[in-house]
Every structure is written in C-alpha cells, then in structure tokens.
Amino acid sequence: MNIFRITADLAHAVAIVILLLKIWKSRSCEGISGRSQILFAVTFFTRYLDLFTSFYSLYNTVMKVLFLAGSIGTVYLMWVKFKATYDRNNDTFRIEFLVIPSIILALIINHEFMFMEVMWTFSIYLEAVAIMPQLFMLSRTGNAETITAHYLFALGSYRFLYIFNWVYRYYTESFFDPIAVVAGIVQTVLYADFFYLYITRVIQSNRQFEMSA
C-alpha cells in the first residue's frame, strides 16, 4: 500500500471533518468561502462519475464517498442551513474565470477525448484553482479564525503530500501523469504564502492567522 497516498487522503479527510465541525459547532460559516466549496463539490462530482460503474477497491470507494459527501454536506450547511451567517460581501471572486478555462483546457489537453476522461481532467484542473476564492476572501478580510487556518493547512497538506505519492509511483511503478502532476504543483504553489504565515504565526507564535498586507 502506498503510504504517501494514504497519508494525503487522511489529511484531506481531516480537513473535511475540521470544516464540518467548525461550521456545525459554531453554527456559522463565517470566514469560509462558499464559492470555493461549490468548486470543490463540482470537482468531486465530476471526478467520481464512475462511482456506480467501476470498482477498484474498498478503500478507493470509501474515499470517493467521503470526499463527495463531505463536499455536498458543506455546501448544504453554507448555502441552506446557516446561509444567514455566510459572508457574501467578502466572497466575491468570479468563479467563472476558473470554471471556463478549466473546461477549455480539459477539452484540449486530456488523455483521451471521451466524456468520462474529459470530466476527470476537468476536475483535476478545477481542483488546482478551487482554493483561490478562499484565499481571495482571506486577503479581503485580513484574518481568519485559528480553526479555519487549521482546515486550510490540512487541505494544502493533502495536495503537497500527493507530490510524494507521484514520486513514489514513478520510481516503483514507472507511472507518471503529467496532467495531475502539473495541476498538483500549481495547487501547492497557491498555498505557499499561506503555509508560511500559518507556520510562523499560528504554530510558532500561537496567534490568530492574519494575512500580510
């Protein structure tokens, strides 16, 4: 079993749990970008279209269900149950600037021009940039609750750890997927400034997370 993939998936699962608990216990989705959460839900819906048509392993199926259910649950809590607490004034990133290029790229650059493959490729491109509305929202508000920072760190760690998974698979299986690798690197780079601030301010100084001016 690939320990790097398992660790990355666990980091992703932890991020989802942190976010859901944060919203449920505080009865508020303040500080969370509803637009990013919609993009994540679209990402996993289009990536896991094969959930009911293909079976690879129990682990794979459980993770697919967890990520999909977690994303849908988060969208429900933010846009339905606790919508009165959603900060629409600061969550203003134009997501069509992310969705449309992802669609175009998926149609042009893919492994095979078939519906399921194009949808999978689209999900990879979209996930790479889905965090941008959240980071944009942080830049507008200037700070975030510590629990929100923990969520974002766990989410960023998941993608960072997947880089080690790809390196491991390359050396053990001679497997290399340039689409997933390039998109993953782009996604990790987007988190770089956040990682630095998280480690220096939240972890080392035990302060509230604040974006630099």
Curated annotation (Swiss-Prot):
GO terms for biological process: protein retention in ER lumen; protein transport; vesicle-mediated transport. It is a multi-pass membrane protein. Residues 1-2, 54-61, 111-117, 169-178 are lumenal. GO terms for cellular component: cis-Golgi network; endoplasmic reticulum; endoplasmic reticulum membrane. InterPro entries: ER_ret_rcpt. The chain crosses the membrane at residues 3-21, 36-53, 62-80, 97-110, 118-137, 150-168, 179-199. Required for the retention of luminal endoplasmic reticulum proteins. Determines the specificity of the luminal ER protein retention system. Also required for normal vesicular traffic through the Golgi. PANTHER family: ER LUMEN PROTEIN RETAINING RECEPTOR. This is ER lumen protein-retaining receptor. It comes from Caenorhabditis briggsae.
